[in-house]
Amino acid sequence: MATSPDMLCSFCPAPFKEFFETVTNMKFDEEPNYAKLISLFDGLIESPASRPIRIDEALKVGQKRGRSQVNHEEDGQHKKKVRLGSPASQWISVYNARRPMKQRYHYNVADNRLQQHIEKGNEDGLYISCVASSANLWALIMDAGTGFGSQLYEISTVFLHKDWIMDQWEKSFYITAIAGASNGGSLVVMSKGTPYTQQSYKVSESFPFKWINKKWKEGFHVTSMATAGNRWGVVMSRNAGYSEQVVELDFLYPSEGIHRRWEHGYRITSSAATSDQAAFILSKPKRKPVDETQETLRTSAFPSNHVKDKWAKNLYIASICYGRTVS
């Protein structure tokens, strides 16, 4: 964190500082000791007999920032957390070092304008590499480095249209990019020429961490993610080219976690965010890239000017999403 506990809690009683330090220093999947945290404030309030507040249920809670697993629906999903205040949403763009290539972006694209942009890109030898959505409009990244042979897409009023996806699977197309809109709709891109041999996807009211864990054990890795409102869509594929994969999920942009993963050879390969949470999939590729440089950028508006600066350094958009970054 940029602001120290001393500064934030300088005018607060000592227990507040200790509480703050404990919580902010917890690990991603560490379960809080609620009894200990609550006991910090015993000296500041009246005895339990004079305060009619039940804390026994709080002691049973097993979550920190929605990270541990609880029983919810059939999948043991994270329960949604409600926080006060006005969260800020931004564009989160991820850039990878690549050999010089042609890349093109479009943003604030309405449904009826999407086809002309895609057709023009295809004519120029470009295929869609990633998509995103903000305010029910689409952002589209197309480039010459996908390796795809052909590509299909569908805009649907439902989030990840199952029948259409299954029809394309039958034709040996695989999902290569997805985006969800706040109105519940989605844009799904499926391609030929991928290394994938099998795919599975899940739509969930909360981040499907338990399902991801299950699929990891079956040899799948996350290859695409998106959100529609507060719903999550995650696509996992076999033969994705990764040896290991981890998740960073937080109410804020997890800068420290991402940098720590970078130091251990991971790179961001998927990202998605709701108005409440941001999730990043970081993977270790089986084949180490020649240049492992990766940068991220957070901007209030679509980063059109920044993209051109990145291109000048041979850094190209690899992932982009719009959602929660700061409280």
What are these model-predicted stretches?
Residues M1-K27:
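C-terminal lobe of the eukaryotic/viral protein kinase catalytic domain
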Residues D42, E46-L84:
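Regulatory extensions appended to serine/threonine kinase catalytic cores
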Residues R65, G76-S327:
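Terminus-proximal functional modules
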Residues F20-P52, R65:
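Terminal C-lobe "cap" of eukaryotic-type protein kinase domains
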Residues N33-L44, I53-L59, N136-W138, N183, ...:
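Short amphipathic alpha-helical segments embedded in low-complexity Lys/Glu-rich regions
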